[in-house]
A protein has these predicted regions:
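Short, conserved catalytic or adaptor-binding loops enriched in Gly and charged residues
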Residues: 3, 89-95, 190-194
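Extracellular/periplasmic catalytic domains that process cell-envelope and extracellular macromolecules
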Residues: 5, 111-119, 149-152, 159-161
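Mid-length scaffold segments of soluble, non-membrane domains
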Residues: 73-104, 115
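Active-site-adjacent structural segments surrounding the nucleophilic cysteine of cysteine proteases
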Residues: 1-81, 149
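Solvent-exposed loop/turn segments at secondary-structure junctions
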Residues: 47, 69-71, 107, 126-130, ...
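Noncatalytic regulatory segments and standalone regulatory/sensor domains
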Residues: 37, 133-150, 157-206
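Structural recognition of the beta-strand scaffold that forms the well-ordered cores
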Residues: 101-102, 120-124, 157, 167-169
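Extracytoplasmic/secreted envelope proteins and their assembly/folding machinery
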Residues: 41-49, 59, 63, 90, ...
Length: 206
C-alpha cells in the first residue's frame, strides 16, 4: 500500500449523501439506479485504487473514466457491479494501476493478503439477520428500518489488520459510523458466512 498510514485512515467514500460527504456522486446514475442505491462496489473500488496507488480519485472520477471508456451502463456493461472481476484486469491495470486476484473466503487468507500490502474488495449479505454489520461506534444497529441489513448483498474494502481486528471501510453510511470499522476474527468469519461470492485481493501493478 503506497498511501501513508494517516491518509489511509482518513480515506473514505460513502455511497449515500451522508451529511454531504457523498454529495458529489451519490445521485449519479449507476448500475440500474444510482450510486447511493447501487454504488457500494464503485465506492469500495475507488478506496482500493487510492490506497494502493496514492492517487486522489473519487467515485465520481472513477465513474467518469468508466463512461469515457464505454464501461458504464448496467446490463450492457461488463463492469456492472463487479468492478474487480479478473476479466477487467487489463483495463484496471491500464486505467487505474491495479490488478485483482481471487482470494479464499477465510480469515487466514484475508490476514495473509493484508500482511503483504494488498487490500480486499469483499462482499457478503445478511439475508437471515444472523451476522449483522458493525459500526465504528461499536453498535450493531441496522440502518434498514426492517431490521435486516443488506439482504441483497454489500461490498466493502478491508484494508488493514491491527491489534487483533480487521479494519473495514464500509460505504453504507457516514464516516463516523462506517470508516475503519473493527471486525474481530470471529465477527469476520460470521460476516463471510453471508454468501459464497468470490472475494478479490487487489494489488498495485508493479
Amino acid at each position: 500500500m503506497l498511501m501513508p498510514q494517516e491518509s489511509a485512515r482518513m480515506l473514505f467514500f460513502p455511497q449515500a449523501y451522508a451529511d454531504g460527504e457523498g454529495a458529489q456522486w451519490s445521485r449519479l446514475p449507476y448500475w440500474w439506479q444510482d450510486v447511493e442505491l447501487s454504488g457500494c462496489g464503485l465506492c469500495s473500488a475507488t478506496v482500493c485504487i487510492d490506497l494502493l496507488t496514492n492517487r486522489d480519485l473519487t467515485p465520481r472520477d472513477v465513474l467518469t473514466r468508466y463512461r469515457e471508456d464505454g464501461m458504464d451502463g448496467a446490463g450492457a456493461s461488463k463492469v456492472g457491479g463487479r468492478n474487480m472481476s479478473v476479466l477487467l484486469n487489463e483495463y484496471n491495470a491500464r486505467a487505474f494501476g491495479i490488478r485483482s486476484f481471487p482470494i479464499e473466503r477465510s480469515v487466514g487468507a484475508f490476514r495473509q493478503a493484508l500482511g503483504q500490502g494488498d487490500v480486499i474488495w469483499a462482499s457478503s449479505s445478511d439475508r437471515q439477520g444472523t451476522h449483522p454489520w458493525h459500526y465504528a461506534d461499536g453498535s450493531m444497529e441496522p440502518l434498514d428500518p426492517c431490521g435486516i441489513q443488506h439482504p441483497h448483498g454489500h461490498i466493502v474494502c478491508v484494508w488493514a489488520y491491527e491489534d487483533g481486528a480487521f479494519l473495514v471501510k464500509d460505504p453504507l453510511g457516514p464516516s463516523q459510523l462506517c470508516n475503519n470499522v473493527r471486525y474481530t476474527d470471529d465477527q469476520m468469519e460470521r460476516w463471510l458466512a453471508g454468501n459464497d461470492h468470490q472475494q478479490y485481493r487487489v494489488s498495485a501493478v508493479r
